[in-house]
Amino acid sequence: MITPAFDISQDSDFLTIIIKVPYARASEIDIYIEGDDFKFYAKPYFLRLALPGRIVEDGRQKATYNADDGIITVSVPKETPGQHFEGLDLLTSLLAPRGSKSAKPLVEEIGSSDNVVEEEEDEFDWQIEQTPFVEPTEEALQSQCTYGFGNLRSGVFRRLQEELNDVIDLRDPDVTPASERTRRRLAAEKAKFDPDHYLADLFEEEPVQHLLKYQPWWVAEIHAGCSLSAESQERRVSFSDKQKEQLRKFTNKSHLLDKKTQQQAYLGLIDLLLAYCYEVRVTEGDQNVESAWNIRKLSSTLSWFENFTCVKDILVSFGRRVLCYPLYRNFQLVEKAIADTVSLLKLGKAAVLKCLLEIHAIFQENDPAYILNDLYITDYCIWIQKVKSKKVASLSDCVQSLSISKSDLGFELGELEEAARLVQEEETQGQLASSTCLVRPLATVASESSDTDSSTSDTDDSSSETEDSTSEESTSEEEADPTDSELQKAIVPGQNSRVQSSLEKAGEEKNKLPAAGKAETTVTEQMKHLAEKMNSAVILSEAPVGPPGVQDKSPEKKAGECTAQSAQSTTGTPMTREFLEVTPRLNPLLIVPLSDEDDELAEH
């Protein structure tokens, strides 16, 4: 038989059941109504529902069939008008069989009879009683190496350890007791914590601030209305067709948990919801390929098979893992995820079930993580449908009453942040000081420019004085020996025109001089280099002083004698030569490199 897809809604007087039977015949439909039991049969479909309230067949019931869509709508009156049926959206729990059974199950739940009056339970205490530590024996250690929902599984990883290394952080879970798991987890978190990554997310606030402004769908539902009654909670939570299909596929079963294991199941649920709320916030509700990794990595229950004993330990463990593993490692995100979890629990077990179904779908699509559905998520999806709403509300109040600080996480975050701020202040002050040194006042630049102009004018004056003295000496020498003057003109032809052109070029270069802010050392080196070229090029030789009778020789003979005398000077014969006196202070206006044409004239 096939269990058909169905949906249930209610108003104050009637219960409406919509059943999808596309391949059924309208002539073969049977409906059975009695008390809290509803049965539907249309070959090949069969549906049996155990309702949370009583219905009655009094003639007001009716059924309609849409042959085009293959949908049957059954409207059944409530036995007590105005009664609210709780948990109609928890489809798996509605499929539970009741009444007499033809065969007894292998494991029977004691006290499941309808005639047994449910005892009123005391207020749930979320703090498990502490017991003194006793060194366990080897047999006791083997019995403690259990995991999964309610610690009901063991031996799963004995043959699959290599394949499941990427799923969980715990190695050899089948031989590692709970106390050793906690110790290894704390050591791994301490080794994984990266101060640089944490400080980068702390001071780069823009990405984190954007994530902090996001509101998950359940927070928006809480803000949309003030009422948190069971009826209001069910109206706010709706399941998709895919989620309803998944609920119908779950096998309905009862979990036999003692008080301690039941409390650990509730605490593990908080751990799962914290990891899920963080994932929804950082992805802004848009799941990606990293979603499965984020959820299982942030949950110590999934990654280390941790069994918590109090809510505070869960919050501390979650905060430590947020600062060690994901992309965004900020303490404000930890606080936001805790607040989101409180809001989710306030919305009721239907909202919790919806989130668990989303986790189940994420793991189902991730190849190595599907094993976590078998160990935890599937059982949580079935179990949460049967828990009492007041326990979920009590769990929400417990989480809301607690808070954690950075000092609780054990990473010395306060000292780390203070040291980072001091370093940041020092760097800021150093940058301000360097910028002040680089930006010189405008008045200083102007004064340096005026000093440069004055030094240039002084150099021009000294150069002109030197030229005057040189011209006077040459004039006196020409008067004393006019032949020597003619010889100098023959040796260095066109010297006067070259000096004149040099002065003109120097005047043009003066107009092209760079601003006063240029480096003075570079200009000085260039001046020295050009001066050496000028000294090597501009050398004026005078004729040697001889007897008086030699002065009436022709210029050609004088040139020959000069050549002979220069040859004798190379052999050691003393000769008197005079050079043009160069001013000891270099004048940049007279330093002009010789052209190739001038070099040829100087050689001839």
UniProtKB/Swiss-Prot annotation:
Keywords: Cytoplasm, Nucleus
Domain CS: 1-89
Pfam families, per the entry: SHQ1 (PF04925), SHQ1-like_CS (PF21413)
Lineage: superkingdom: Eukaryota
Compartments in which it is found: Cytoplasm, Cytosol; Nucleus, Nucleoplasm
UniProt record, GO biological process: box H/ACA snoRNP assembly; protein-RNA complex assembly
Composition-biased stretches (Acidic residues): 458-484
Compositionally biased residues, Low complexity: 447-457
Compositional bias of kind Polar residues: 494-503, 563-574
One GO CC annotation: nucleoplasm
PROSITE patterns noted in UniProt: CS
Main location as per UniProt: cytoplasm
InterPro entries to which the protein is assigned, alphabetical: CS_dom, HSP20-like_chaperone, Shq1, SHQ1-like_CS, Shq1_C
Chain positions covered by the region annotation Disordered: 445-521, 541-575
Role, per record: Required for the quantitative accumulation of H/ACA ribonucleoproteins (RNPs).
Family affiliation: Belongs to the SHQ1 family.
Protein name per its UniProtKB record: Protein SHQ1 homolog
Origin species: Xenopus tropicalis
